[in-house]
Every structure is written in structure tokens, then in C-alpha cells.
């Protein structure tokens, strides 16, 4: 009987630790996605989109941050 109780306790601890790891991964991934969305939003607001395929340029800037460029009338991550 004691072995059954200890086994169940170990399983509960293992699953709790695994759940915490998954939660931590979800937080990191959502922050990364939020950063990409912010950079894209920044690019869309700051860029003058060129029809001839030149790099997008903000006011006084050579490039958009985060690797974004204006291509095909869209702000794309390159």
C-alpha cells in the first residue's frame, strides 16, 4: 500500500513539473510573437512604401528595425 501511495505522489510531482515547463514555454513564445508584431507595426507606421522595391525608410532612418523591409507594397520580414 505504501508503494502505491509513493508512486502516485511521484506521478503528481512529475506532472506538475511538466505543466510548469509547458507554461514557461508558452510565455516565451508569446513574448517572441509580441515582439515580431510590434516590429511589424512599427515598420508599417514609419515606412514610406516604395513601388519600385527599394528598402522601406522611416523619417530619417535607413531601414526599419528587426529586419523588416517594404516589398511588393507590403512590409515583410526578410
Swiss-Prot record:
Cellular component annotations (GO), alphabetically ordered: extracellular region
Pfam families named among the record's database cross-references: Toxin_20
Location in or out of the cell: Secreted
Tissue expression per record: Expressed by the venom gland.
Maturation-removed propeptide residues: 20-40
Keyword Signal among record annotations: yes
UniProt similarity note: Belongs to the neurotoxin 12 (Hwtx-2) family. 05 (OAIP-5) subfamily.
Protein name, per record: Toxin OAIP 5
Gene source species: Selenotypus plumipes (Australian featherleg tarantula)
Amino acid at each position: 500500500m505504501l508503494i502505491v501511495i509513493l508512486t502516485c505522489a511521484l506521478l503528481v510531482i512529475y506532472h506538475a513539473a511538466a505543466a510548469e515547463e509547458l507554461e514557461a514555454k508558452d510565455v516565451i513564445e508569446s513574448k517572441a510573437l509580441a515582439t515580431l508584431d510590434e516590429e511589424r507595426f512599427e515598420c508599417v507606421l514609419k515606412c514610406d512604401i516604395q513601388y519600385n522595391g527599394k528598402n522601406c525608410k522611416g523619417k530619417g532612418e535607413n531601414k526599419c528595425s528587426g529586419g523588416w523591409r517594404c516589398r511588393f507594397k507590403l512590409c515583410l520580414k526578410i
